């Protein structure tokens, strides 16, 4: 700010020595008028008139006590209330104090719109897939298995050589050879849609086997080979699917798939003599 030069004689005559007349205030009705003088950026003297509306209101005792506190610093000799020289009046801000339970509910409500932002593809949790605690486990493989199964099933169905005509059981692969000699055996035991799953762990159970193949397609029966004495899994099992394309999808998806720290081997079940 530029300095405002005045003569010593003018300041003595005006009864002020800082180059500015003193501020004054007066009350008229419900309004209070405060007149102040200051220098602008160009070094010119300007007059500022502030108008305040006087309102009476009931305040808490704590607020009334704060107004009677002894002021300090540049406001030591000021009257009760704000001084425009040392205090800047701004907008009134209303605050609402709530308890911890209400805060938790409000916080959860604010987070509701963002729930769909992060969704795990492995466990469908509210976090990114890279941070999923089930990453690399059997639960992580389910999504991959479903994707591969759908692709393999679609490829099997779209194969023109397998659509559009009826294939008798005795003419299917593993159905008992050509002609009608083995028709009875093919009808009683149809292994055309059966697969053999090997390299299973000893702790494998029927429930685990069911969980492993149920995402691929419907099946008619399962057989888990067990030791007679210990009851532990021998390491292989047979699954008969309802549709041959589902069996093909199982081979495509599960063969070479890691399960229970082992690599599965899945192939077509060979016809029993």
Curated annotation (Swiss-Prot):
Compartments, record wording: Cytoplasm
Domain RRM: 193-271
Database matches in Pfam families: eIF3g, RRM_1
GO BP term, pick one: formation of cytoplasmic translation initiation complex
Region feature Disordered, mapped onto this chain: 168-192
Disulphide bridges, residue numbers: none
Biased composition (Gly residues): 173-183
Membrane-crossing segments per the record: none
A Gene Ontology molecular function term of the record: translation initiation factor activity
Keyword tags: Cytoplasm, Initiation factor, Protein biosynthesis, RNA-binding
Similarity remark: Belongs to the eIF-3 subunit G family.
Quaternary structure note: Component of the eukaryotic translation initiation factor 3 (eIF-3) complex. The eIF-3 complex interacts with pix.
Function text: RNA-binding component of the eukaryotic translation initiation factor 3 (eIF-3) complex, which is involved in protein synthesis of a specialized repertoire of mRNAs and, together with other initiation factors, stimulates binding of mRNA and methionyl-tRNAi to the 40S ribosome. The eIF-3 complex specifically targets and initiates translation of a subset of mRNAs involved in cell proliferation. This subunit can bind 18S rRNA.
UniProt protein name: Eukaryotic translation initiation factor 3 subunit G-2
Name of the gene this protein is made from: eIF3g2
């Amino acid at each position: 700010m530029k300095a405002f030069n005045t003569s010593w004689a003018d300041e003595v005559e005006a009864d002020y020595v800082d180059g500015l007349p003193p501020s004054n205030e007066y009350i008229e009705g419900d309004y209070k008028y405060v007149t102040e003088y200051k220098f602008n950026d160009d070094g010119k003297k300007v007059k500022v008139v502030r108008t305040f509306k006087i309102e009476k209101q009931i305040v808490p005792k704590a607020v009334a006590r704060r107004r009677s506190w002894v002021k300090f610093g540049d406001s030591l000799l000021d009257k009760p209330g704000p001084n425009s020289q040392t205090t800047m009046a701004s907008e009134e801000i209303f605050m609402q104090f709530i308890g911890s339970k209400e805060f938790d509910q409000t916080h959860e409500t604010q987070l509701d719109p963002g729930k769909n932002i992060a969704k795990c593809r492995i466990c469908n949790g509210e976090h990114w897939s890279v941070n999923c605690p089930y990453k690399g486990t059997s639960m992580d493989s389910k999504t991959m298995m479903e994707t591969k199964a759908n692709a393999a099933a679609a490829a099997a169905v779209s194969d023109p050589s397998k659509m559009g005509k009826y294939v008798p059981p005795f003419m299917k692969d593993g159905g008992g050879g050509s002609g009608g000699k083995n028709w009875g055996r093919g009808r009683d035991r149809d292994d055309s849609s059966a697969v053999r799953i090997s390299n299973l762990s000893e702790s494998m159970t029927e429930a685990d086997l069911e969980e492993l193949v149920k995402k691929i397609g419907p099946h008619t029966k399962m057989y888990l080979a067990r030791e007679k004495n210990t009851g532990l899994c021998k390491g292989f099992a047979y699954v008969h699917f309802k549709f041959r394309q589902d069996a093909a999808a199982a081979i495509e998806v599960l063969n070479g798939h890691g399960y229970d720290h082992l690599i599965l081997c899945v192939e077509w079940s060979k016809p029993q003599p």
